[in-house]
C-alpha cells in the first residue's frame, strides 16, 4: 500500500487541458477488453468527454508549440559541462519525431467523430438511462459480436489517437521531470509561494495524515490550503511537512 499520495495541479489552461486528455486516454484502456454493458458505457463516456475537450481548443497547435519549446530548452543544455550529450540528443530526436508525426496526422479525433456507433452512443449519454437496449439496439448488437471483432474496432479507434498520445506523453514526462521535489512546511494548514512561471505543481503528502490540498493560483503565484478528509472531526497540524515540485 502506498504511504504517500501524489497530487498534481495545473497552473495554466493548456496544462489543465493536457492533464484532462491524459486522464481520459488512460481511462479508455482500464476496462479493456469490453465484454459487457458497464464496460462499454465507461469506454464510450470517456470517448465522448475526450471529443468534447478536443472541440474546446487548439490541442494540436498548443502541443506543437510545446514540443518546439522543449527542444529549445534542451538546446540550452548542450553547452553545459558534464551533461549527458547522448541523452540530450536522443530526447531532441524524440521531440522532433513526435512533432512530425503530429503535424502530419489527420485532425485529432476525426476518426472517432465520424464513427456511427460512437455518434449514436454520444447522443444518448446525456439522457438518464438513455443507453438501454431499446434506446440503442446498435450498441446492444455490438456487445453480442465476437470479442475479437470488438477488440479490433477498439484497437483502431485507440490507434487513431497515437500521434496525440505519443506527443502528450513525451511533453508531460519532460515537464514533470523538470523540477525536483523539495521539502516544504505549511503553517496552520496554509502555504504560498511564487510560481516562477511554472506550468504544474506536484505535491506529495503522507497518506496517514488524511489531508488533501486545495490549490489556487497561476504561473506567477499560488496558494495551498490543506483540508482534512473528515471535515467534521479531522485536524490539520500547526506545522505540516510535505514535498513540492514546481514544474
Swiss-Prot record:
Disulfide bonds: none
Protein role: Cell division factor that enhances FtsZ-ring assembly. Directly interacts with FtsZ and promotes bundling of FtsZ protofilaments, with a reduction in FtsZ GTPase activity.
Keywords: Cell cycle, Cell division, Cytoplasm, Septation
Family stated for the protein in its record: Belongs to the ZapD family.
Transmembrane segments: none
Compartment list: Cytoplasm
Gene Ontology cellular-component annotations: cell division site; cytoplasm
Name of the protein: Cell division protein ZapD
GO aspect biological process, one term: division septum assembly
Assembly and binders: Interacts with FtsZ.
Classification via PANTHER family: CELL DIVISION PROTEIN ZAPD
Pfam family, one: ZapD
Amino acid at each position: 500500500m502506498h504511504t504517500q499520495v501524489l497530487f498534481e495541479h495545473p497552473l495554466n489552461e493548456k496544462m489543465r487541458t493536457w492533464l484532462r486528455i491524459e486522464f481520459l486516454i488512460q481511462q479508455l484502456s482500464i476496462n479493456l477488453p469490453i465484454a459487457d454493458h458497464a464496460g462499454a458505457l465507461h469506454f464510450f463516456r470517456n470517448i465522448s468527454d475526450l471529443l468534447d475537450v478536443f472541440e474546446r481548443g487548439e490541442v494540436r497547435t498548443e502541443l506543437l508549440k510545446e514540443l518546439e519549446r522543449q527542444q529549445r530548452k534542451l538546446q540550452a543544455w548542450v553547452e553545459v559541462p558534464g551533461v549527458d550529450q547522448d541523452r540530450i540528443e536522443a530526447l531532441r530526436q524524440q521531440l522532433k519525431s513526435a512533432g512530425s508525426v503530429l503535424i502530419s496526422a489527420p485532425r485529432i479525433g476525426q476518426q472517432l467523430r465520424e464513427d456511427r456507433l460512437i455518434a449514436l452512443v454520444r447522443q444518448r449519454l446525456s439522457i438518464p438511462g438513455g443507453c438501454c437496449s431499446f434506446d440503442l439496439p446498435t450498441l446492444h448488437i455490438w456487445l453480442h459480436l465476437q470479442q475479437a471483432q470488438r477488440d479490433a474496432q477498439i484497437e483502431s479507434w485507440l490507434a487513431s489517437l497515437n500521434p496525440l498520445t505519443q506527443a502528450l506523453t513525451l511533453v508531460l514526462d519532460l515537464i514533470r521531470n523538470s523540477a525536483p521535489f523539495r521539502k516544504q512546511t505549511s503553517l496552520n494548514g496554509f502555504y504560498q509561494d511564487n510560481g516562477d512561471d511554472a506550468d504544474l505543481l506536484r505535491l506529495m503528502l503522507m497518506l496517514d495524515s488524511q489531508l488533501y490540498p486545495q490549490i489556487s493560483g497561476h504561473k506567477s503565484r499560488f496558494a495551498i490550503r490543506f483540508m482534512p478528509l473528515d471535515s467534521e472531526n479531522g485536524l490539520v497540524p500547526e506545522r505540516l511537512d510535505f514535498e513540492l515540485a514546481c514544474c
